[in-house]
């Protein structure tokens, strides 16, 4: 497939528009939306990123097959981009710690509708290993001690020297293009 059609993983970046609503009793309330495409780094580079339920849902979709750079910082995407909705239980959303001032109550389920224009495979530390492959225990959480091979307090996906030997990982790996 075309690289523009990349299907993002939990460790990647996406360019999208979205609408987020929380479900409170029998009605929904808008808490966030954008009509202009924005870029989300799913894991973030600190305690951030997007909620697990959102990146899990987005990872089932592909971006457009192509786009045109308008030269002014905007893009026109082919009309075959991913369109979807994700219904997120509170345990995969904000659970009991809703963002202050968001209007989201603790334990509210969420609904996101979105248009996924582009998925971008990330290598956050530039070591030649895609970030999703640096999740050593396979649990889709990159900030854990289990994902810090050399125990230096920096998770592998942000550590350009994963094994702590003083030699950058990019200089140690061998890529087979077979």
Predicted features, each with a name:
Residues 15, 51, 55-58, 130, ...:
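Extracytoplasmic/secreted envelope proteins and their assembly/folding machinery
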Residues 12-16, 112, 156:
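Residue-level detector of short, conserved catalytic/binding motifs and their immediate flanks
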Residues 10-24:
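A short beta-strand signature
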Residues 22-108, 112, 126:
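A beta-strand/beta-hairpin structural motif
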Residues 5-10, 101-106, 144-148:
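Short consensus segments that form the blades of beta-propeller domains
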Residues 17-21, 113-115, 172:
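Residue-level recognition of well-ordered beta-strand positions that form the cores
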Residues 118-178:
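Extracellular calcium-associated, cysteine-rich motifs in secreted modular proteins
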Residues 1-13, 122:
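Start-of-domain signal
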């Amino acid at each position: 497939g075309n690289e523009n059609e990349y299907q993002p993983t939990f460790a990647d970046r996406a360019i999208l528009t979205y609408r987020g609503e929380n479900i409170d009793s029998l009605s929904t309330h808008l808490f966030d939306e954008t009509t202009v495409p924005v870029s989300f780094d799913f894991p973030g580079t600190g305690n951030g990123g997007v909620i697990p339920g959102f990146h899990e849902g987005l990872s089932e979709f592909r971006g457009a097959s192509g786009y045109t750079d308008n030269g002014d910082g905007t893009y026109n995407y082919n009309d075959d981009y991913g369109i979807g909705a994700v219904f997120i239980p509170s345990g995969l959303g904000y659970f009991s710690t809703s963002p202050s001032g968001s209007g989201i109550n603790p334990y509210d389920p969420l609904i996101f509708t979105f248009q996924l224009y582009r998925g971008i495979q990330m290598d956050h530390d530039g070591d030649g290993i895609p970030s999703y492959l640096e999740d050593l225990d396979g649990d889709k959480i990159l900030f854990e001690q289990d994902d810090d091979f050399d125990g230096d307090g920096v998770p592998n996906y942000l550590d350009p020297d994963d094994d702590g030997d003083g030699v950058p990982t990019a200089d140690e790996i061998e890529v087979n293009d077979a």
